């Protein structure tokens, strides 16, 4: 487990995780309860609680972004990282990066504001877009940092994908496992005691913690939230075709490996009022970060590096939860006051209809099926197996798109063609011309 600060009382991490089961099962068998402010309800996978007025825990925690003294919290961050400067060799910290605009913000803060010398690490999704490839190279070039890239064998990656799709109905697990463990392995191997992440998704969406808790990444939170309680070791159980040595990349370091490393993983969002949209747009303007239209949403910054996330993964999310990634984006925008709840409802309905009428990203799903060597029928069978048979959706009529909604959607930067125009995945590609 990554080291966390010790207190004399129950640590925030433990306090939050004690109620994991209760939160995760909260909506099961209960009447549907929707937040009075955002679009989330009590079926949220991270779990939501509601106050007496019907406001969800995610909205309550988000309110801290306007109530906390963030200048003071930045000072706390500066004090926190000071002991790590030059303490163990060349690198002060490890930073996991992806090819999206907000990772420019992470580097801008860590290197330009805090004065740390980071080692960048990036785990290859195998589904890279040209936009993502270009952003990743631009990050390395702009901030003049060393970077370690981890690319698994395509054959092994596909074997892991088949296992997680058949066992958990997930196409995102292989990347999440690698993305969350590769930085820890590098930190242990290179004796770098600090890992810096942008934000903690359960806190940003469902208010799992207060920013005052200053929660840190641990093995347990990764297991519960990122990996759906399914570890790399589970991949080789039963009738799996995978061998032990093929899943080592996805396995968390052992307690013995971690014992002497004293590695901790912190989230910048505990010290900065994290706003993915605002920060991304600042980075587009300041450093030339790239943005592109994604299927299924108006957001041109989130996961523009991954052709499967906003297509196949989004289709699975809709099947499993009844809503797509666009709801996450809309809830964020409601909370920041950039769209009204009524307009968000209308916009979500329009995307739901578009998803239904286009066959649920059928072109992009077929691209994935061809890559993995499976049929659409086999995929649908797995969806039925994991999430129940799909019934015909009854969609409420989408409201006519108003000029205000059109302006809202067009307010997002577009510096490259839509990622859906790309006809093949890039494993390793050329990002910059020199």
Regions found by a protein language model. Give the residues of each.
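Nucleotide-activated chemistry modules centered on ATP-dependent adenylation/adenylyltransferase
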Residues: 2-94, 109, 113-434
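Short, glycine-rich nucleotide/cofactor-binding loops
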Residues: 93-103
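Contiguous, well-ordered alpha-helical segments that form the cores/surfaces of helical PPI scaffolds
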Residues: 104-108
């Amino acid at each position: 487990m990554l080291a966390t600060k010790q207190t004399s009382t129950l640590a925030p991490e433990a306090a939050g995780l004690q109620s994991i089961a209760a939160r995760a099962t909260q909506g099961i068998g209960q009447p549907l309860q929707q937040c009075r402010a955002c679009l989330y309800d009590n079926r949220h996978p991270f779990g939501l609680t509601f106050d007496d007025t019907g406001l969800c825990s995610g909205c309550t925690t988000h309110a801290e972004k306007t109530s906390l003294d963030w200048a003071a919290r930045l000072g706390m961050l500066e004090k926190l990282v000071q002991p790590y400067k030059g303490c163990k060799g060349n690198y002060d910290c490890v930073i996991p990066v992806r090819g999206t605009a907000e990772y420019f913000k992470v580097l801008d803060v860590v290197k330009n504001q805090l004065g740390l010398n980071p080692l960048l690490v990036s785990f290859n999704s195998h589904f890279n877009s040209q936009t993502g490839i270009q952003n990743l190279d631009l990050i390395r070039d702009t901030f003049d940092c060393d970077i370690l890239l981890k690319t698994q064998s395509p054959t092994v990656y596909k074997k892991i994908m088949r296992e997680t799709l058949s066992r958990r109905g997930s196409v995102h697990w292989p990347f999440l496992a690698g993305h969350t463990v590769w930085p820890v392995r590098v930190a242990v191997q290179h004796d770098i005691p600090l890992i810096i992440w942008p934000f903690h998704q359960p806190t940003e969406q469902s208010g799992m913690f207060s920013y005052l808790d200053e929660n840190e990444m641990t093995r347990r939170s990764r297991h519960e939230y990122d990996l759906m309680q399914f570890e790399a070791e589970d991949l080789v159980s039963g009738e799996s075709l995978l061998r032990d040595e093929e899943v080592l990349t996805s396995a968390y370091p052992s307690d013995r490996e971690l014992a002497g490393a004293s590695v901790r993983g912190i989230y910048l969002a505990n010290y900065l009022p994290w706003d993915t949209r605002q920060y991304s747009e600042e980075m587009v303007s300041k450093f030339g970060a790239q943005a592109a239209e994604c299927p299924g949403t108006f957001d041109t910054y989130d996961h523009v590096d991954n052709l499967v996330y906003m297509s196949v993964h989004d289709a699975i999310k809709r099947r499993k939860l009844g809503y797509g990634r666009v709801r996450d984006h809309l809830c964020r925008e409601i909370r920041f006051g950039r769209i009204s709840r009524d307009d968000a409802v209308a916009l979500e309905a329009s995307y739901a209809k578009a998803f239904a009428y286009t066959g649920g990203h059928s072109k992009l799903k077929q691209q994935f099926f061809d890559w993995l060597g499976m049929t659409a029928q086999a995929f649908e069978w797995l969806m039925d197996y994991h999430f129940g048979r799909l019934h015909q959706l009854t969609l409420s009529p989408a409201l006519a798109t108003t000029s205000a909604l059109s302006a809202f959607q067009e307010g997002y930067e577009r510096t490259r063609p839509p990622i859906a125009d790309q006809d093949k995945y890039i494993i390793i590609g050329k990002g910059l011309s020199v």
